[in-house]
Amino acid sequence: IGMIVECEKEGYLMEANGCKRSCTLRPGHYCANECSYVKGKNGYCYAWVACYCYNMPDSVKIWDSATNTCGRGK
C-alpha cells in the first residue's frame, strides 16, 4: 500500500521574466488572490514589495536568489 504525499512549498511568486511578483501600489488582497490562483493556501505582500505565498503545490515556480534571472533579459 502506497501513499502519495505532496510537499507544499512557500516563497515569492515569480513573473515570466524571472522577477518577483510586485505588489507595490496594489490593494491589500492582491497577493492573497494571486496565491489562491496558483492553488496556494495563503499569501501577503511582503514589505509592500513582493507577493509571498504559503502552501503552494510543488509545481509552482518561485523566485530563488540562486537562480535569479530578473533584469537579465531572459
UniProtKB/Swiss-Prot annotation:
UniProt subcellular location: Secreted
GO MF: sodium channel inhibitor activity; toxin activity
Major place of residence: secreted
InterPro entries cross-referenced by the UniProt entry: LCN-type_CS_alpha_beta_dom, Scorpion_toxin-like, Scorpion_toxin-like_sf, Scorpion_toxinL, Scorpion_toxinL/defensin
A cellular component annotation (GO) from this entry: extracellular region
An annotated GO BP: defense response
Annotated positions of the Arginine amide modification: 72
Keywords, comma-separated and alphabetical: Amidation, Disulfide bond, Ion channel impairing toxin, Neurotoxin, Secreted, Signal, Toxin, Voltage-gated sodium channel impairing toxin
Signal peptide range in chain numbering: 1-8
Domain (LCN-type CS-alpha/beta) ranges: 9-71
Tissue expr: Expressed by the venom gland.
Cystine pairs: 19-70, 23-45, 31-51, 35-53
Written domain comment of the UniProt record: Has the structural arrangement of an alpha-helix connected to antiparallel beta-sheets by disulfide bonds (CS-alpha/beta).
Other observations noted: Negative results: does not affect the cardiac Nav1.5/SCN5A, the peripheral nerve channel Nav1.7/SCN9A, and the voltage-dependent potassium channel Kv1.5/KCNA5.
Function description: Beta toxins bind voltage-independently at site-4 of sodium channels (Nav) and shift the voltage of activation toward more negative potentials thereby affecting sodium channel activation and promoting spontaneous and repetitive firing.
Family: Belongs to the long (4 C-C) scorpion toxin superfamily. Sodium channel inhibitor family. Beta subfamily.
Protein name: Toxin Td6
Organism: Tityus discrepans
